[in-house]
Amino acid sequence: MHPGELQQAAQIIRRGGLVAYPTEYCFGLGCDPLHRAAVLRLLRLKRRPVDKGLILIAADTEQLARYVTEIPEHVRASWPGPHTWLVEPRESVPGWITGQHPRLAVRVTAHPVAAALCKAAGMALVSTSANRGGGVPARTDREVERLFGRELDFVIHDVVGDAPAPTPIRDAVTGELVRPG
C-alpha cells in the first residue's frame, strides 16, 4: 500500500464515495452504511438487489454499537476474525443495509488493511465482495480495476488475506449456518 492511500480512501468514504479494499478472502467494495446514495450506487454497480442486505465490517465492536442492540459474548469471542454473524439491528438501521432480513450481518475484521480503513474513516463500513451479480470475487487490485475501472472512486493497493473461502455467516441467536465458509 502506498503512503497516504488509507487517509485518501477514508476521506472518499466520508464524502460518500465507493472504495475497494482487501479483506480476509477477496477484495471488498465499501462505503458509509448511512449514506443512502453511496449504498444504492454500490448496489447498482454490483447489480445486487437491495433486498439481499449487506455486511458491515468494523475495526472493533464499538464501531458496531450504533447498528446493533447487543453483541453476544460468543460472537465477541470469535473476533477479530473471518466470522460474520447475524445479530439484532437497532430500529434506526435503514432497510438498504438489512434488506428483507430481520437481522444484520456484522464482522470485526482481522484483515489489517480493512481494519485500518475502518479506523481511519471512523466508522463501520459496508463490505460486499468485489464482483458483479454473482460473479467470481476479485482477489487482486488489478482484477478490481479490470472489473470496475473508473466506476469506483478509489482502490487500495494491497493484498487479500489467506482465508480459503468467503467468511461463513451464522445466526448469532439460532446458531444456524446461513452461508458456509
Question: What feature does the model see in each segment?
Answer:
Residues 1-181:
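Active-site-adjacent structural elements in enzyme catalytic cores
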